[in-house]
């Protein structure tokens, strides 16, 4: 498995057989992608793009529920990295199980950015038959005209927890463990603790029950000091009736988003070792910001990408969640 996918991993890790030279090409090499290929991949399966170079050199190494592909983009042209060359973006294709999932992620990224969360850049790209989410990689940086890798590790990796146990109820990271990890490791722990708090509350208020330990990462600077990476994989999972609404991480001792009230936020404050007033203030401020931003974000999405069923459904789901939160506080 590592031989097949190790050339272009998340972060700066590169894995190749001991007897072979490094896969990293100098200079990097890329193969252009045609519109026909993009259309084929957008409606196909992983097998549709598993050997796109014809030489077995393309290496898919990005985990998740969607079909996705690391690519290099230059002047809006998409290329496939060859022989371990760095990618710059990730393409996420439509899911056969969850309708309009790329659009969902693009909308939620716009919403998160509008209320002040640090979030990856996500935009939509259309093919004749589908829409694709294009996510800019935060672990790639342009240096002297060439893209290089910045190392990252998600919180399951940082805590030595198997990705198969990424949910707290299965032994995955809790918010308390994440906060303790930040205090031990982060270059600026107070700044990153505040980001963690906002991330957890935003996910609760916007109906994202899939905010688990692999959706938080450290990004390492050249000095080796880690900081919390921009947030990614923000999705309104409550938009899908067949998905569990149970939170991936407890908030104040409960995983039921409909029961969370001020008493749970006070327990959350104790878990994070911050003042209860800070947590309550952040929660109230985010609730008001999200409520006030939904209409503008919907208009912005419509302007950028055109109409989509998510523009009616997701704001409705989020407004219901905000009303439930208000009722618990009152």
Where are these regions (language model features)?
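Phosphate/dinucleotide-binding and metal-coordinating scaffold of catalytic cores
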Residues: 1-330
């Amino acid at each position: 498995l590592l031989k097949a996918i190790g050339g272009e991993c998340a972060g700066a890790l590169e894995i190749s057989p001991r007897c072979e030279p490094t896969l990293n090409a100098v200079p990097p090499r890329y193969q252009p992608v045609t519109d026909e290929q993009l259309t084929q991949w957008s409606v196909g399966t992983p097998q549709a793009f598993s050997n796109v170079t014809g030489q077995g050199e393309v290496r898919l190494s990005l985990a998740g529920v969607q079909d996705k592909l690391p690519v290099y983009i230059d002047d809006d042209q998409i290329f496939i990295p060859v022989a371990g060359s760095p990618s710059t973006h990730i393409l996420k294709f439509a899911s056969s199980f969850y309708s309009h999932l790329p659009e969902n992620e693009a909308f939620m990224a716009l919403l998160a950015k509008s209320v002040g969360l640090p979030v990856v850049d996500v935009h939509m790209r259309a093919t004749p038959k589908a829409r694709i989410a294009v996510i800019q990689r935060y672990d790639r940086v342009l240096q002297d005209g060439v893209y290089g890798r910045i190392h990252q590790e998600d919180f399951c990796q940082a805590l030595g927890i198997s990705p198969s146990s990424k949910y707290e109820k299965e032994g995955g990271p809790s918010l308390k463990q994440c906060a303790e990890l930040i205090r031990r490791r982060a270059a600026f722990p107070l700044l990153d603790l505040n980001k963690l708090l906002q991330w957890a509350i935003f996910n609760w208020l916007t109906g994202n029950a899939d905010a688990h330990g692999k959706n938080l990462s450290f990004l390492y600077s050249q000095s080796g000091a880690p900081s919390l990476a921009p947030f990614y994989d923000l999705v309104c999972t409550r938009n899908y009736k067949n998905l569990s609404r149970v939170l991936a991480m407890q908030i104040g001792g409960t995983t039921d988003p409909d029961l969370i009230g001020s008493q749970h936020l006070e327990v959350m404050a104790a878990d994070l070792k911050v003042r209860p007033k800070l947590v309550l203030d952040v929660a109230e401020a985010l609730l008001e910001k999200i409520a006030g931003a939904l209409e503008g974000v919907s208009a912005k999405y419509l302007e950028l990408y055109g109409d989509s069923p998510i523009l009616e459904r997701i704001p409705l789901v989020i407004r219901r969640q905000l009303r439930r939160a208000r009722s618990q506080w009152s």
